[in-house]
Amino acid sequence: MAMLLRVATQRLSPWRSFCSRGSQGGLSQDFVEALKAVVGSPHVSTASAVREQHGHDESMHRCQPPDAVVWPQNVDQVSRVASLCYNQGVPIIPFGTGTGVEGGVCAVQGGVCINLTHMDQITELNTEDFSVVVEPGVTRKALNTHLRDSGLWFPVDPGADASLCGMAATGASGTNAVRYGTMRDNVINLEVVLPDGRLLHTAGRGRHYRKSAAGYNLTGLFVGSEGTLGIITSTTLRLHPAPEATVAATCAFPSVQAAVDSTVQILQAAVPVARIEFLDDVMMDACNRHSKLNCPVAPTLFLEFHGSQQTLAEQLQRTEAITQDNGGSHFSWAKEAEKRNELWAARHNAWYAALALSPGSKAYSTDVCVPISRLPEILVETKEEIKASKLTGAIVGHVGDGNFHCILLVDPDDAEEQRRVKAFAENLGRRALALGGTCTGEHGIGLGKRQLLQEEVGPVGVETMRQLKNTLDPRGLMNPGKVL
C-alpha cells in the first residue's frame, strides 16, 4: 500500500496495464487500502449493493457496477484519488445524483466511482456580480433555497433535482431555457480535476467575469463532456434577478400541428415567454391521472411568463390571441404560486405519470432538438411513428427551443419490444439530423448515441474530439465507453 501511495503522488509513471486489479477482475486489496488512506475507511465501499446502486442511472441501458465507490470530502482528496487511479490504470467514473438517462455512470470497464455528494457547500456568493460558486454536491433546489432572500435565482431546470456540477457535465437544459439559456450559457468557470490529478480552473482561478476573449474556451470544452475529460469539483454559475411577478397558463389544441404552430408564432411575435412546454394527448391523460389535474386530454401547451404586472398582462393578451387563432381552447391562467407549483410539478412528474400508464413497464426516454421552423414537421411525424411502431409512448418537450422528449414504455422481459424501441430512438435521431438538428438537445450522448454523434459531426469532427480526449486523458480512464 505504501508503494501505491507513493505512486499516487507522481504525475507520470509507466503504464501499468491495470496492475491494481485483482485476479478476479476486481481491485486488489492493496489498492482498496490505498483508497482508504486517502479518503478514510468509512468513505470507501466495495459492498455489492452499494456498487450496484452506483452502476446505473434512470436509463434502460445495460449497465455494469464499479469495483469500488469512494466519497471524497474535498478537492484535494479527489485529486489524490484521481492520481492514484491514473498511475494504476484504473477507470474513474464521476457520480452526482445519478439522474441521467443515457447510461453516463455505467462502469463499462469497472473501476472507481467517485461519488461527489459529500462536497455540498456553496462556497461563494457575489450578489453584485450575479454569480455563485458551488461544489458538486449542491443541487438546483438547494441553491435556489439558499438564494431565496437575495433577490436572485438560478433558472436552469431539467426537472430532476440534479447536482449543478452534474448538470454542467451533461450540458443540461430544461423548461426555462427559452428565456434563460442552457447550462452552456450559465456556467462562467469550472474547477476540474484532470485524469492525472492536476487541478484546472477553466477561466482562471477565482475569475467570474461575464465575457472574455482570452484564448480558447476551456469552460465550454468541459461543459457537456459527460465526465470523459475530467472531474468537475466546483462550478461558478451566472445568476439572474428573480422576476417581479410570474403567471402560468395552459391551453389545449385540436392537433399537434396547431399547438406547435402556436409555439412558433409566439416566439416570432417576440413574446418574452419564460417557459413553453408541449405535452401530447397521451401525456396529458397520464398527468391528469397521476397529478390529479383536470385538463382536456389533447395536445397542450404549458406556459409561464416573467416580468412586471403591466408587462405580464400584455404578454398574456398577445399569447391568448395567437393560441385562439390556431384553434386553442380552455386557455387558463394560474397566478397564485400554489396553482403554478401544482402545474409545474405535474410537468416535472411526467416521467412517473407515464410509467403509471403501464404498471410493471420500464420507461425509455430519448430527446432530439431541431430548428424551430422544422418542429411542427418532426413532431407530427414522430407522433405517427409511435402509433405505427405499436409502442406506448408520450411526447413532452421544451418546444420553445426546438427540443422534445419521447417517453416510451417497455416490457423489460420483451426483447422484441425493446428492439422496436431502440429502432424508434435511432430513427428519431436520424430524422432530427436530416432536418438540420441534433440527436440530443440535453440528455447527452452517453452509451446510447455514439453512432449518431458520428453521423452528426462527421469523421473530422469525431477525430478532433478524439484527439482532445487523448490529449487530456491519454490512458482512456475517464468514464470510458461514453461519447466516443
From Swiss-Prot:
<feature type="modified residue" description="N6-acetyllysine">
    <location>
        <position position="449"/>
    </location>
</feature>
<dbReference type="GO" id="GO:0004458">
    <property type="term" value="F:D-lactate dehydrogenase (cytochrome) activity"/>
</dbReference>
<keyword id="KW-0496">Mitochondrion</keyword>
<dbReference type="GO" id="GO:0071949">
    <property type="term" value="F:FAD binding"/>
</dbReference>
<keyword id="KW-0274">FAD</keyword>
<keyword id="KW-0560">Oxidoreductase</keyword>
<dbReference type="InterPro" id="IPR016169">
    <property type="entry name" value="FAD-bd_PCMH_sub2"/>
</dbReference>
<dbReference type="InterPro" id="IPR016167">
    <property type="entry name" value="FAD-bd_PCMH_sub1"/>
</dbReference>
<dbReference type="GO" id="GO:1903457">
    <property type="term" value="P:lactate catabolic process"/>
</dbReference>
<feature type="modified residue" description="N6-acetyllysine; alternate">
    <location>
        <position position="335"/>
    </location>
</feature>
<comment type="similarity">
    <text>Belongs to the FAD-binding oxidoreductase/transferase type 4 family.</text>
</comment>
<dbReference type="Pfam" id="PF02913">
    <property type="entry name" value="FAD-oxidase_C"/>
</dbReference>
<comment type="subunit">
    <text>Interacts with CSRP3.</text>
</comment>
<dbReference type="InterPro" id="IPR016171">
    <property type="entry name" value="Vanillyl_alc_oxidase_C-sub2"/>
</dbReference>
<dbReference type="GO" id="GO:0008720">
    <property type="term" value="F:D-lactate dehydrogenase activity"/>
</dbReference>
<feature type="modified residue" description="N6-acetyllysine">
    <location>
        <position position="422"/>
    </location>
</feature>
<dbReference type="InterPro" id="IPR004113">
    <property type="entry name" value="FAD-bd_oxidored_4_C"/>
</dbReference>
<dbReference type="InterPro" id="IPR036318">
    <property type="entry name" value="FAD-bd_PCMH-like_sf"/>
</dbReference>
<dbReference type="InterPro" id="IPR006094">
    <property type="entry name" value="Oxid_FAD_bind_N"/>
</dbReference>
<dbReference type="GO" id="GO:0006754">
    <property type="term" value="P:ATP biosynthetic process"/>
</dbReference>
<dbReference type="GO" id="GO:0005739">
    <property type="term" value="C:mitochondrion"/>
</dbReference>
<dbReference type="Pfam" id="PF01565">
    <property type="entry name" value="FAD_binding_4"/>
</dbReference>
<keyword id="KW-0007">Acetylation</keyword>
<protein>
    <recommendedName>
        <fullName>Probable D-lactate dehydrogenase, mitochondrial</fullName>
        <ecNumber>1.1.2.4</ecNumber>
    </recommendedName>
</protein>
<feature type="transit peptide" description="Mitochondrion">
    <location>
        <begin position="1"/>
        <end position="52"/>
    </location>
</feature>
<dbReference type="GO" id="GO:0005743">
    <property type="term" value="C:mitochondrial inner membrane"/>
</dbReference>
<dbReference type="InterPro" id="IPR016166">
    <property type="entry name" value="FAD-bd_PCMH"/>
</dbReference>
<dbReference type="InterPro" id="IPR016164">
    <property type="entry name" value="FAD-linked_Oxase-like_C"/>
</dbReference>
<feature type="modified residue" description="N6-acetyllysine">
    <location>
        <position position="292"/>
    </location>
</feature>
<feature type="domain" description="FAD-binding PCMH-type">
    <location>
        <begin position="62"/>
        <end position="242"/>
    </location>
</feature>
<comment type="function">
    <text>Involved in D-lactate, but not L-lactate catabolic process.</text>
</comment>
<keyword id="KW-0809">Transit peptide</keyword>
<feature type="modified residue" description="N6-acetyllysine">
    <location>
        <position position="36"/>
    </location>
</feature>
<keyword id="KW-0285">Flavoprotein</keyword>
<feature type="modified residue" description="N6-succinyllysine; alternate">
    <location>
        <position position="335"/>
    </location>
</feature>
